[in-house]
């Protein structure tokens, strides 16, 4: 897990020059290709698609380069179950969010813009957190690292630090 922090932070910052070596170190330490793909895919929910896509391209380039050098990196596992759809996805995402936060999430912002709450529940906590080839502790560690590099994300950083504390103490 220690290699997830620099990879996540550098990818969120868009620091490709330093991301390559961090990815190399992670692979050398046994982090699987699919674990890194999960972290860098999850990145888009926090830092946007451009940074996620650029980081994934950097990983792909590195894996191909290493393959050319005869290094066979562990691909790791894929998700073991299909992601729910429709109402089942909303239900799963809401349950995941509630478990991570420690209580149901609501409030004035979600009353004002209910679509954002639905997107969080169905997509972030549904589609992404239902993928079981990266554990929740690693996902939250990655999220905290990502948010810590982003200006103006203090409220979200605090929220995810609280979620991490709940995960690591339960």
Model-derived regions, located:
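Structural motif
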Residues: 1-2, 30-36, 132-138
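A structural feature that tracks compact, well-ordered secondary-structure segments
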Residues: 10, 22-25, 132-133, 143-163
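Hydrophobic/aromatic-rich structural module bridging two neighboring secondary-structure elements via a short loop
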Residues: 22-60
């Amino acid at each position: 897990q220690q290699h997830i922090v620099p990879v996540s932070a550098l990818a969120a910052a868009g620091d490709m020059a330093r991301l390559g070596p961090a990815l190399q170190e992670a692979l050398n330490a046994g982090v699987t290709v699919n674990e890194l793909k999960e972290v860098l895919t999850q990145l888009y929910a926090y830092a946007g698609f451009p940074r996620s896509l650029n980081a994934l391209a950097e990983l792909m380039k590195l894996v191909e380069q290493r393959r050319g050098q005869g290094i066979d990196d562990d691909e790791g596992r894929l998700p073991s179950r299909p992601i729910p759809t429709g109402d089942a996805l909303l239900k799963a995402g809401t349950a995941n969010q509630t478990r991570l936060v420690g209580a149901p999430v609501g409030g004035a912002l979600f009353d004002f813009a209910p679509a954002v709450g639905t997107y969080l529940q169905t997509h972030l906590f549904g589609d992404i957190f239902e993928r079981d080839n990266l554990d929740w502790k690693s996902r939250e560690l990655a999220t905290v690292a990502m948010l810590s590099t982003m200006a103006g994300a203090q409220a979200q950083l605090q929220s995810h630090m609280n979620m991490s504390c709940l995960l690591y103490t339960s």
